[in-house]
């Protein structure tokens, strides 16, 4: 009975998630706390950001929706900084044994001018469930650009999952694991201790989705974050601490009907 209930809830959550962020494209906890915009914050939403990284980075995240372990997303990856073409590898898993979504992603970025960077990514998303006799997947691509008119301002534009090609069982509707969307956003370091970020998104399900976030840095090692996202309205809150090359981030998102989702992330930069 529990498995049946969880499967029904999974289908419902998948439906709710189509409009903006699919179950597999969960950003790092910093970005999630800032409203989950991401187009100027994480290479997962904009591969061009790889070109602006100054260090290599390993990371791992755990995000639990609504305190239900079967709705957890686990992700990890590595961003490699080099002078030729910075690259990244990301792996994500959502669900549990009876229902599993997986993502394997490779991305590249390149600074093409003093103020411009361009990036592309290729990913394979896989859906496996006891409800289906066969698995189903999608191969898709992302493209993104970043423009920095001045040192403390960045703007970004990315197109996610375009194009997208279905593999495996064609009778399974798996569009939610590779939902097409276009994002445009900015971040602005107003002063040394405050950063604001905002994103507008157009997707297959929602004409416009918006997010806004703010990060306050009372100390170099400690950061407090808050954000909000529309469709539906979801406020978020989080914090981060850095020590000896390690970043530890926590975050939570509140949904008026389904409750609180929480997560933790750890990264090492060198």
Predicted regions and their residues:
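Subset of outer-membrane beta-barrel
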Residues: 21-270
């Amino acid at each position: 009975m529990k498995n049946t209930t969880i499967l029904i809830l999974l289908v419902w959550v998948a439906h709710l998630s189509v409009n903006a962020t699919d179950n597999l494209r969960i950003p790092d906890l910093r970005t999630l706390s800032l409203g989950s915009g991401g187009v100027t914050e994480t290479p997962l939403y904009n591969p061009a950001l790889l070109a602006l990284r100054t260090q290599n980075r390993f990371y791992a995240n755990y995000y639990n929706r609504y305190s239900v372990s079967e709705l957890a997303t686990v992700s990890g990856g590595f961003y490699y900084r080099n002078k030729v073409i910075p690259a990244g590898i990301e792996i994500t898993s959502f669900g549990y044994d009876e229902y599993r979504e997986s993502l394997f992603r490779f991305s590249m970025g390149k600074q093409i001018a003093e103020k411009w960077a361009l990036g592309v990514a290729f990913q394979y998303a896989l859906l496996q469930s006891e409800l289906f006799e066969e698995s189903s997947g999608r191969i898709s691509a992302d493209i993104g650009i970043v423009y920095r008119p001045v040192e403390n301002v960045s703007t970004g534009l990315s197109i996610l999952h375009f194009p997208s090609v279905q593999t495996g069982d064609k009778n399974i509707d798996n569009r939610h694991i590779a939902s097409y969307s276009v994002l445009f956003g900015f971040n602005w370091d107003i002063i040394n201790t405050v950063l604001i970020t905002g994103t507008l998104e157009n997707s297959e399900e929602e004409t416009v989705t918006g997010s806004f976030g703010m990060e306050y840095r009372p100390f170099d090692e400690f950061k407090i974050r808050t954000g909000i996202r529309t469709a539906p309205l979801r406020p978020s809150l989080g914090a981060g601490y850095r020590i000896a090359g390690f970043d530890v981030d926590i975050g939570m998102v509140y949904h008026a009907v389904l409750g609180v989702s929480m997560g933790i992330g750890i990264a090492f930069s060198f």
